[in-house]
Protein backbone atom coordinates (compact mmCIF):
# COMPACT_ATOMS: atom_id res chain seq x y z
CA UNK A 1 0.00 0.00 0.00
CA UNK A 2 1.22 3.53 -0.84
CA UNK A 3 1.42 5.29 2.49
CA UNK A 4 1.62 8.72 0.84
CA UNK A 5 -1.38 8.22 -1.44
CA UNK A 6 -3.86 5.77 0.13
CA UNK A 7 -6.45 4.17 -2.08
CA UNK A 8 -9.81 6.04 -2.11
CA UNK A 9 -11.55 2.87 -0.86
CA UNK A 10 -9.53 3.07 2.32
CA UNK A 11 -10.60 6.70 3.03
CA UNK A 12 -13.79 7.94 4.53
CA UNK A 13 -15.90 10.38 2.56
CA UNK A 14 -14.70 13.25 4.76
CA UNK A 15 -11.07 12.29 4.26
CA UNK A 16 -11.63 12.04 0.51
CA UNK A 17 -13.05 15.56 0.40
CA UNK A 18 -10.13 16.85 2.48
CA UNK A 19 -7.68 15.17 0.12
CA UNK A 20 -9.37 16.74 -2.91
CA UNK A 21 -9.26 20.14 -1.22
CA UNK A 22 -5.54 19.75 -0.50
CA UNK A 23 -4.87 18.76 -4.11
CA UNK A 24 -6.84 21.77 -5.35
CA UNK A 25 -4.93 24.14 -3.04
CA UNK A 26 -1.67 22.56 -4.16
CA UNK A 27 -2.61 23.12 -7.78
CA UNK A 28 -3.59 26.74 -7.04
CA UNK A 29 -0.37 27.28 -5.14
CA UNK A 30 1.72 25.93 -8.01
CA UNK A 31 -0.17 28.15 -10.45
CA UNK A 32 0.38 31.18 -8.20
CA UNK A 33 4.06 30.35 -7.91
CA UNK A 34 4.32 30.13 -11.69
CA UNK A 35 2.50 33.46 -12.06
CA UNK A 36 4.96 35.03 -9.61
CA UNK A 37 7.87 33.57 -11.54
CA UNK A 38 6.44 34.95 -14.77
CA UNK A 39 5.87 38.36 -13.19
CA UNK A 40 9.40 38.42 -11.73
CA UNK A 41 10.84 37.43 -15.09
CA UNK A 42 8.81 40.21 -16.71
CA UNK A 43 10.06 42.74 -14.15
CA UNK A 44 13.68 41.68 -14.72
CA UNK A 45 13.12 41.93 -18.47
CA UNK A 46 11.76 45.45 -18.02
CA UNK A 47 14.72 46.36 -15.79
CA UNK A 48 17.15 44.99 -18.37
CA UNK A 49 15.34 46.92 -21.07
CA UNK A 50 15.38 50.12 -18.99
CA UNK A 51 19.06 49.72 -18.12
CA UNK A 52 19.88 49.06 -21.75
CA UNK A 53 17.92 52.14 -22.81
CA UNK A 54 19.56 54.20 -20.04
CA UNK A 55 23.00 52.97 -21.03
CA UNK A 56 22.21 53.78 -24.64
CA UNK A 57 20.96 57.23 -23.65
CA UNK A 58 24.04 57.88 -21.51
CA UNK A 59 26.31 56.60 -24.27
CA UNK A 60 24.59 58.92 -26.73
CA UNK A 61 24.91 61.85 -24.31
CA UNK A 62 28.59 61.11 -23.72
CA UNK A 63 29.12 60.92 -27.47
CA UNK A 64 27.40 64.28 -27.95
CA UNK A 65 29.46 65.80 -25.12
CA UNK A 66 32.65 64.56 -26.76
CA UNK A 67 31.62 65.99 -30.14
CA UNK A 68 30.63 69.27 -28.49
CA UNK A 69 33.97 69.60 -26.71
CA UNK A 70 35.86 69.02 -29.95
CA UNK A 71 33.70 71.59 -31.74
CA UNK A 72 34.24 74.09 -28.90
CA UNK A 73 38.01 73.61 -28.93
CA UNK A 74 38.05 74.29 -32.69
CA UNK A 75 35.41 77.06 -32.76
CA UNK A 76 34.06 78.14 -29.34
CA UNK A 77 30.92 79.87 -30.66
CA UNK A 78 29.89 76.85 -32.76
CA UNK A 79 30.69 74.55 -29.85
CA UNK A 80 28.36 76.42 -27.48
CA UNK A 81 25.66 76.45 -30.17
CA UNK A 82 26.02 72.66 -30.53
CA UNK A 83 25.70 72.14 -26.75
CA UNK A 84 22.52 74.22 -26.66
CA UNK A 85 20.96 72.57 -29.73
CA UNK A 86 21.53 69.12 -28.20
CA UNK A 87 20.15 70.26 -24.82
CA UNK A 88 23.48 69.70 -23.09
CA UNK A 89 23.40 73.39 -22.08
CA UNK A 90 20.65 75.96 -21.75
CA UNK A 91 21.01 79.39 -23.39
CA UNK A 92 21.17 80.94 -19.90
CA UNK A 93 24.43 82.88 -19.46
CA UNK A 94 24.85 81.53 -15.91
CA UNK A 95 24.66 77.96 -17.21
CA UNK A 96 27.20 78.67 -19.95
CA UNK A 97 29.52 80.43 -17.49
CA UNK A 98 29.44 77.54 -15.01
CA UNK A 99 30.14 75.11 -17.85
CA UNK A 100 33.21 77.13 -18.90
CA UNK A 101 34.32 77.55 -15.29
CA UNK A 102 34.29 73.78 -14.71
CA UNK A 103 36.10 73.43 -18.03
CA UNK A 104 35.91 69.62 -18.28
CA UNK A 105 37.61 68.64 -21.53
CA UNK A 106 37.65 72.25 -22.76
CA UNK A 107 40.74 73.94 -24.11
CA UNK A 108 41.74 76.91 -21.95
CA UNK A 109 42.73 78.96 -25.00
CA UNK A 110 39.31 78.33 -26.53
CA UNK A 111 37.66 79.43 -23.26
CA UNK A 112 39.68 82.66 -23.40
CA UNK A 113 38.69 83.19 -27.02
CA UNK A 114 34.97 82.84 -26.20
CA UNK A 115 35.15 85.09 -23.13
CA UNK A 116 37.03 87.76 -25.09
CA UNK A 117 34.41 88.34 -27.79
CA UNK A 118 32.39 91.59 -27.80
CA UNK A 119 29.04 90.00 -28.59
CA UNK A 120 26.52 91.01 -25.86
CA UNK A 121 25.98 87.37 -24.85
CA UNK A 122 29.73 86.79 -24.55
CA UNK A 123 30.10 89.91 -22.41
CA UNK A 124 27.36 88.65 -20.08
CA UNK A 125 28.99 85.21 -19.92
CA UNK A 126 32.34 86.85 -19.10
CA UNK A 127 30.76 88.68 -16.16
CA UNK A 128 29.04 85.51 -14.93
CA UNK A 129 32.29 83.54 -15.40
CA UNK A 130 34.24 86.03 -13.28
CA UNK A 131 31.49 85.88 -10.66
CA UNK A 132 32.07 82.11 -10.40
CA UNK A 133 35.43 82.93 -8.79
CA UNK A 134 35.56 83.47 -5.04
CA UNK A 135 38.40 85.85 -4.16
CA UNK A 136 37.43 86.70 -0.57
CA UNK A 137 40.43 86.80 1.82
CA UNK A 138 42.91 86.14 -1.00
CA UNK A 139 45.74 88.56 -1.67
CA UNK A 140 46.00 89.85 -5.22
CA UNK A 141 48.63 87.33 -6.35
CA UNK A 142 46.58 84.41 -5.02
CA UNK A 143 43.48 85.71 -6.82
CA UNK A 144 45.41 86.21 -10.05
CA UNK A 145 46.79 82.67 -9.85
CA UNK A 146 43.25 81.32 -9.62
CA UNK A 147 41.87 83.59 -12.34
CA UNK A 148 44.66 83.14 -14.89
CA UNK A 149 44.57 79.35 -14.49
CA UNK A 150 40.88 79.13 -15.39
CA UNK A 151 41.47 80.20 -19.02
CA UNK A 152 44.25 81.44 -21.26
CA UNK A 153 44.43 85.21 -21.63
CA UNK A 154 44.10 86.20 -25.32
CA UNK A 155 46.60 88.46 -27.03
CA UNK A 156 44.40 91.37 -28.14
CA UNK A 157 44.61 94.49 -25.97
CA UNK A 158 40.86 95.22 -25.95
CA UNK A 159 40.02 91.67 -24.87
CA UNK A 160 42.64 91.74 -22.11
CA UNK A 161 41.31 95.11 -20.95
CA UNK A 162 37.73 93.80 -20.61
CA UNK A 163 38.81 90.65 -18.80
CA UNK A 164 41.11 92.40 -16.35
CA UNK A 165 38.53 95.13 -15.73
CA UNK A 166 36.01 92.42 -14.80
CA UNK A 167 38.61 90.73 -12.58
CA UNK A 168 39.48 93.96 -10.76
CA UNK A 169 35.81 94.75 -10.13
CA UNK A 170 35.16 91.24 -8.78
CA UNK A 171 38.27 91.29 -6.56
CA UNK A 172 37.34 94.63 -5.01
CA UNK A 173 33.78 93.40 -4.44
CA UNK A 174 35.09 90.30 -2.62
CA UNK A 175 37.68 92.31 -0.66
CA UNK A 176 36.24 95.74 0.20
CA UNK A 177 38.74 98.23 1.59
CA UNK A 178 41.90 96.62 0.18
CA UNK A 179 42.14 99.23 -2.60
CA UNK A 180 40.59 102.66 -2.93
CA UNK A 181 39.34 101.94 -6.45
CA UNK A 182 39.12 99.22 -9.07
CA UNK A 183 41.63 101.23 -11.14
CA UNK A 184 44.23 100.60 -8.43
CA UNK A 185 43.54 96.86 -8.54
CA UNK A 186 43.64 96.91 -12.35
CA UNK A 187 47.04 98.66 -12.57
CA UNK A 188 48.61 96.58 -9.80
CA UNK A 189 47.37 93.36 -11.44
CA UNK A 190 49.16 94.26 -14.67
CA UNK A 191 52.27 95.27 -12.74
CA UNK A 192 52.29 91.82 -11.14
CA UNK A 193 51.81 90.07 -14.51
CA UNK A 194 54.69 92.08 -16.01
CA UNK A 195 56.81 91.40 -12.91
CA UNK A 196 56.17 87.68 -13.35
CA UNK A 197 57.49 87.90 -16.93
CA UNK A 198 60.52 89.97 -15.94
CA UNK A 199 61.49 87.63 -13.09
CA UNK A 200 60.93 84.28 -14.79
CA UNK A 201 61.25 84.69 -18.57
CA UNK A 202 64.67 83.20 -19.50
CA UNK A 203 65.02 85.75 -22.30
CA UNK A 204 64.86 88.67 -19.85
CA UNK A 205 68.30 89.32 -18.38
CA UNK A 206 67.46 92.38 -16.29
CA UNK A 207 65.69 91.08 -13.17
CA UNK A 208 63.87 93.99 -11.52
CA UNK A 209 64.58 94.49 -7.79
CA UNK A 210 61.83 95.16 -5.28
CA UNK A 211 62.60 98.90 -5.32
CA UNK A 212 61.77 99.11 -9.02
CA UNK A 213 58.46 97.33 -8.42
CA UNK A 214 57.63 99.90 -5.73
CA UNK A 215 58.58 102.74 -8.07
CA UNK A 216 56.37 101.32 -10.85
CA UNK A 217 53.35 101.53 -8.57
CA UNK A 218 53.78 104.93 -6.94
CA UNK A 219 50.62 107.01 -6.73
CA UNK A 220 48.30 104.36 -8.15
CA UNK A 221 46.02 104.25 -5.07
CA UNK A 222 44.03 107.38 -6.01
CA UNK A 223 47.20 109.43 -5.89
CA UNK A 224 48.74 107.86 -2.79
CA UNK A 225 51.14 104.93 -2.45
CA UNK A 226 50.21 101.42 -1.43
CA UNK A 227 51.72 100.11 1.83
CA UNK A 228 55.24 98.86 1.18
CA UNK A 229 54.71 95.67 3.19
CA UNK A 230 51.71 94.84 0.96
CA UNK A 231 53.85 95.28 -2.15
CA UNK A 232 56.66 93.24 -0.54
CA UNK A 233 54.33 90.29 0.07
CA UNK A 234 53.12 90.38 -3.54
CA UNK A 235 56.67 90.72 -4.90
CA UNK A 236 58.03 87.83 -2.80
CA UNK A 237 55.12 85.58 -3.78
CA UNK A 238 55.77 86.04 -7.50
CA UNK A 239 59.53 85.80 -7.09
CA UNK A 240 59.28 82.46 -5.27
CA UNK A 241 56.62 80.95 -7.55
CA UNK A 242 55.74 82.10 -11.09
CA UNK A 243 52.21 82.02 -12.43
CA UNK A 244 51.13 78.65 -13.81
CA UNK A 245 49.88 79.38 -17.30
CA UNK A 246 47.50 76.76 -18.73
CA UNK A 247 49.13 74.54 -21.32
CA UNK A 248 47.22 73.44 -24.39
CA UNK A 249 45.09 70.37 -23.62
CA UNK A 250 46.60 67.17 -24.96
CA UNK A 251 50.19 68.37 -24.51
CA UNK A 252 50.65 69.07 -28.20
CA UNK A 253 50.37 72.04 -30.51
CA UNK A 254 47.57 70.62 -32.64
CA UNK A 255 44.74 72.88 -31.54
CA UNK A 256 46.92 75.99 -31.94
CA UNK A 257 46.68 75.60 -35.70
CA UNK A 258 42.90 75.19 -36.06
CA UNK A 259 42.24 78.85 -36.90
CA UNK A 260 45.52 80.36 -38.11
CA UNK A 261 45.91 83.91 -39.40
CA UNK A 262 47.43 82.48 -42.58
CA UNK A 263 48.84 79.15 -43.80
CA UNK A 264 50.36 77.80 -46.99
CA UNK A 265 53.36 76.36 -48.80
CA UNK A 266 56.42 78.62 -49.08
CA UNK A 267 60.11 78.16 -49.85
CA UNK A 268 62.56 78.84 -47.02
CA UNK A 269 66.29 79.47 -47.40
CA UNK A 270 68.34 77.59 -44.80
CA UNK A 271 70.85 74.91 -43.89
CA UNK A 272 74.64 74.91 -43.57
CA UNK A 273 74.79 74.94 -47.33
CA UNK A 274 72.14 77.50 -48.20
CA UNK A 275 69.36 75.76 -50.09
CA UNK A 276 65.67 76.45 -50.67
CA UNK A 277 63.33 73.95 -49.03
CA UNK A 278 59.56 73.72 -49.37
CA UNK A 279 57.84 74.10 -46.00
CA UNK A 280 54.23 74.38 -44.79
CA UNK A 281 53.96 77.68 -42.88
CA UNK A 282 51.34 78.58 -40.28
CA UNK A 283 50.99 82.08 -38.82
CA UNK A 284 49.18 82.21 -35.48
CA UNK A 285 49.51 83.64 -31.96
CA UNK A 286 52.29 86.08 -32.95
CA UNK A 287 54.49 83.17 -34.11
CA UNK A 288 55.43 81.72 -37.49
CA UNK A 289 55.61 77.91 -37.50
CA UNK A 290 56.93 75.79 -40.34
CA UNK A 291 56.47 72.06 -40.99
CA UNK A 292 57.91 69.52 -43.39
CA UNK A 293 54.43 68.10 -44.10
CA UNK A 294 50.91 69.39 -43.49
CA UNK A 295 50.15 66.23 -41.46
CA UNK A 296 53.00 66.79 -38.97
CA UNK A 297 51.86 67.48 -35.40
CA UNK A 298 55.12 69.11 -34.33
CA UNK A 299 56.72 71.97 -36.29
CA UNK A 300 60.25 71.84 -37.64
CA UNK A 301 60.76 75.39 -36.48
CA UNK A 302 59.16 78.22 -34.51
CA UNK A 303 59.88 81.90 -35.12
CA UNK A 304 58.47 84.26 -32.44
CA UNK A 305 57.62 87.52 -34.22
CA UNK A 306 58.01 89.83 -31.24
CA UNK A 307 60.44 92.70 -32.05
CA UNK A 308 60.87 91.50 -35.66
CA UNK A 309 60.07 93.32 -38.89
CA UNK A 310 59.21 92.04 -42.36
CA UNK A 311 60.02 93.52 -45.77
CA UNK A 312 60.11 92.72 -49.47
CA UNK A 313 63.54 91.73 -50.70
CA UNK A 314 65.11 90.92 -54.07
CA UNK A 315 66.93 87.61 -54.40
CA UNK A 316 69.02 86.62 -57.42
CA UNK A 317 67.75 83.02 -57.36
CA UNK A 318 64.11 83.27 -56.28
CA UNK A 319 61.33 85.75 -57.08
CA UNK A 320 58.67 87.13 -54.73
CA UNK A 321 60.80 87.04 -51.57
CA UNK A 322 60.19 88.48 -48.12
CA UNK A 323 62.61 88.77 -45.21
CA UNK A 324 62.14 88.61 -41.44
CA UNK A 325 64.75 90.54 -39.46
CA UNK A 326 65.35 92.36 -36.18
CA UNK A 327 65.62 96.08 -37.00
CA UNK A 328 67.30 96.96 -33.70
CA UNK A 329 69.86 94.12 -33.71
CA UNK A 330 71.10 93.72 -37.28
CA UNK A 331 73.75 91.01 -37.46
CA UNK A 332 72.56 89.18 -34.33
CA UNK A 333 70.77 85.85 -34.28
CA UNK A 334 66.99 85.95 -34.18
CA UNK A 335 65.35 84.26 -31.18
CA UNK A 336 63.95 81.07 -32.71
CA UNK A 337 64.16 77.31 -32.40
CA UNK A 338 64.08 74.29 -34.69
CA UNK A 339 64.48 70.50 -34.57
CA UNK A 340 67.72 69.05 -35.89
CA UNK A 341 68.20 65.75 -37.72
CA UNK A 342 68.13 63.80 -34.43
CA UNK A 343 64.83 65.37 -33.38
CA UNK A 344 66.43 67.58 -30.73
CA UNK A 345 65.20 71.13 -30.25
CA UNK A 346 68.05 73.56 -30.87
CA UNK A 347 68.41 77.31 -31.10
CA UNK A 348 68.06 78.80 -34.56
CA UNK A 349 71.13 80.32 -36.22
CA UNK A 350 69.47 82.81 -38.56
CA UNK A 351 70.27 86.51 -38.52
CA UNK A 352 67.32 86.85 -40.89
CA UNK A 353 64.80 84.55 -42.53
CA UNK A 354 64.37 84.68 -46.30
CA UNK A 355 61.16 83.18 -47.68
CA UNK A 356 59.86 82.90 -51.26
CA UNK A 357 56.19 82.89 -52.32
CA UNK A 358 54.69 81.73 -55.62
CA UNK A 359 53.47 85.19 -56.68
CA UNK A 360 53.78 88.86 -55.80
CA UNK A 361 50.19 88.83 -54.55
CA UNK A 362 50.84 85.90 -52.21
CA UNK A 363 54.04 87.52 -50.92
CA UNK A 364 52.21 90.78 -50.19
CA UNK A 365 49.41 88.92 -48.39
CA UNK A 366 51.93 87.16 -46.16
CA UNK A 367 53.71 90.44 -45.43
CA UNK A 368 50.43 92.11 -44.50
CA UNK A 369 49.41 89.22 -42.22
CA UNK A 370 52.82 89.07 -40.53
CA UNK A 371 52.82 92.82 -39.92
CA UNK A 372 49.37 92.56 -38.37
CA UNK A 373 50.65 89.80 -36.09
CA UNK A 374 53.78 91.69 -35.00
CA UNK A 375 52.41 93.70 -32.11
CA UNK A 376 53.75 95.12 -28.90
CA UNK A 377 52.84 93.35 -25.69
CA UNK A 378 49.63 95.26 -24.88
CA UNK A 379 50.07 95.32 -21.09
CA UNK A 380 52.26 98.43 -21.11
CA UNK A 381 49.80 100.51 -23.10
CA UNK A 382 46.88 99.39 -20.93
CA UNK A 383 48.70 100.25 -17.70
CA UNK A 384 49.83 103.62 -19.06
CA UNK A 385 46.26 104.53 -20.05
CA UNK A 386 44.87 103.55 -16.65
CA UNK A 387 47.59 105.44 -14.75
CA UNK A 388 46.69 108.58 -16.71
CA UNK A 389 43.05 108.04 -15.70
CA UNK A 390 44.04 107.80 -12.02
CA UNK A 391 46.20 110.93 -12.30
CA UNK A 392 43.36 112.91 -13.90
CA UNK A 393 41.16 112.27 -10.84
CA UNK A 394 43.60 113.95 -8.45
Curated annotation (Swiss-Prot):
Expressed predominantly in peripheral blood leukocytes. It holds the Pfam family PH. Residues 386-394 are annotated as: C-terminal autoinhibitory region. The keyword Coiled coil applies. One of its GO terms (biological process) is regulation of ARF protein signal transduction. GO terms for molecular function: guanyl-nucleotide exchange factor activity; lipid binding. PROSITE patterns: PH_DOMAIN, SEC7. Keywords: Cell membrane, Coiled coil, Guanine-nucleotide releasing factor, Lipid-binding, Membrane. Residues 12-65 form a coiled coil. It is found in: Cell membrane. A 1,2-diacyl-sn-glycero-3-phospho-(1D-myo-inositol-3,4,5-trisphosphate) binds at residues 268-275, 279, 290, 300. InterPro entries: PH-like_dom_sf, PH_domain, Sec7_C_sf, Sec7_dom, Sec7_dom_sf. Residues 259-375 form the PH domain. Residues 54-241 form the SEC7 domain. It is a peripheral membrane protein. Binds via its PH domain to the inositol head group of phosphatidylinositol 3,4,5-trisphosphate. Autoinhibited by its C-terminal basic region. Promotes guanine-nucleotide exchange on ARF1 and ARF5. Promotes the activation of ARF factors through replacement of GDP with GTP. This is Cytohesin-4. The gene is CYTH4.
Amino acid sequence: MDLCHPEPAELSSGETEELQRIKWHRKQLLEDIQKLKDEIADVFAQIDCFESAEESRMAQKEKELCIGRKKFNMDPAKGIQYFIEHKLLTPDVQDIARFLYKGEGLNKTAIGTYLGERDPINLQVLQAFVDCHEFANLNLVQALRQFLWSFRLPGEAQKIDRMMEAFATRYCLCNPGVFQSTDTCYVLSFSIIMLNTSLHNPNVRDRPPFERFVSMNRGINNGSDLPEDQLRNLFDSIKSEPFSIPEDDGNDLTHTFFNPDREGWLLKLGGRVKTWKRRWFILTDNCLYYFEFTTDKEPRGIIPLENLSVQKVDDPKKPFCLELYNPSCRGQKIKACKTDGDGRVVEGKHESYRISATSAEERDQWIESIRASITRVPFYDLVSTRKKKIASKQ
